[in-house]
Amino acid sequence: SQAYLYQLTKDHYPEVFKEIKQRIAEGRWHAIGSMWVEPDCNIPNGESLVRQVLHGKRFFKNELGVDCDTLWLPDTFGYNWALPQIMKKSGIRYFFTTKLTWNDTNPFRHNTFWWRGIDGSKVLAHIPAVGLEGSITPKDLKKSWDGYHEKQKSPHTIQTFGYGDGGGGPTAEQLETARVLKTMVGLPASTIS
């Protein structure tokens, strides 16, 4: 989700980068992110955040042919109130994070909502009930669905999974488990995407 990591892949592993571009063309890889890196969004000023978006979106468009419309910040600890305005003016319509699920004292009670910025700009935000735990089991799917409070707004939520909390992708075993879970009676309907 970070343009910088794609740049490193292009520079050091050009064959892998070529394969990624092919998967994007096939619709099997969704390049998402919109920023150069996944930054801290509490301390930097607006200009810094604008440049993150400028350089990130430029890379995704020029190198991968993708015009990102989602700001994907699953592991950022806080969010500047100017972000909705910056996103809106940059063609970003959606926001995704998981960090707000970490609060054990004051649980964040919203999953899908319009996030309004300083100037009234708004973007559609989604925060799944389950964060970056990384696993995919019947218990995880049930916890994700049961904790999703906005079913009346949208019948869909996201359950992220992958190898560890550090950006690792799904393992072959996890993908097979997800395929099997799709067929199990009594679990929420699921799709791998």
Each PLM stretch: what is its role?
Residues 1-193:
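Catalytic-domain carbohydrate-binding cleft regions of carbohydrate-active enzymes
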